[in-house]
Amino acid sequence: MNEPSRLRALRRAMSSEDIEALLITRLPDVRYLCGFTGSNAALAVTPRKSVLFTDGRYTAQAHEETRAARVRITEPLQTVVGEACALLERSIPKKIRCYYDPAHTTVSALAAMRASLSTGRRRGFFAPLKEPIVSELRMVKDADELDRIAAAALLGNRLFHAILQHLQPGVPEAEIAASLEFFARSMGAEGMSFETIVASGPRSAFPHGRATAHKTPRNGFVTLDFGVILKGYCSDMTRTVCLGKASRSERSAYDAVLEAQQAAVAAVRPGVTSGEVDEAARSVLQKAGLDKYFTHSTGHGVGLEVHEPPRLGREQKQELKPGMVVTIEPGIYMPGRFGIRIEDMVVVTEKGARVLTPVTKALIEL
């Protein structure tokens, strides 16, 4: 991974906004910038220095993983955020402010920040960022990130083919999810990127239907939405298959969702806004009279986290850029009847989009 170049890019972004000190407490951002994967950390960044703060449990791990930042182990009874703030207060000139991301700073971290200011002489020392500059950097993936995401997606593709062999009527959804997760670990995944969704029959109309003891029907749709973590990066894909033969109305609905998904993939290219991609999917479903059943956005970014910016939703203005990785996942959900969702991960290229999950999207009837 290329942490030094990421910190250089961050410093350029800080300079353009006249930011001379930044405190980062969001763990995926810390990992992105310096490589540390522990569960308790803060990263302080100034124009010339970057210091990772963590506690004594992670001494060896921090020194092994961290690149482009000095490691500082906090004293017992001192919070990581509090010690980072105290150092910044001592080392930064009085008129300089330290910025933080208000969207990803917890209440406890904010309390530690305030408590670290021992006197009122630095009132206003901490200030919220106007724009989430680390999140903006993370939206465009570098070559190493793209390789890792592609590898995770490839593993997801293999999992889909493996789990098809276990899909049959009368099997608890939770058993299917457990089998899928077992296969994932057996194939080298570090874990699942989110709780596996297996929703069958009328439950497929739940967009985020958790796998339950409900048994798969003799006839009806089964929605499989899953992802893995590999080398720290996530995958995410959805396919909807049919047990038994689909009815005419089920097939017609499936074809409409597939057409919407393909239209959105075709709309992805540099310069297009995320809202325009959403509209490409939504307009197809509108023509089919199904848009009222499409109750979520068309997609989202994927990387160190399975849900990242940009969001591909109505009226979203984020312009797509080469190197962004997003999902395209329109769906329809008819309560009491069925639901259908089809999801691919795509990377934005110089000329369009490359699909990372090229598993068949033709309706599979088992």
Predicted regions and their residues:
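Active-site neighborhoods and metal-handling regions in enzymes and metal-associated proteins
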Residues: M1-L366
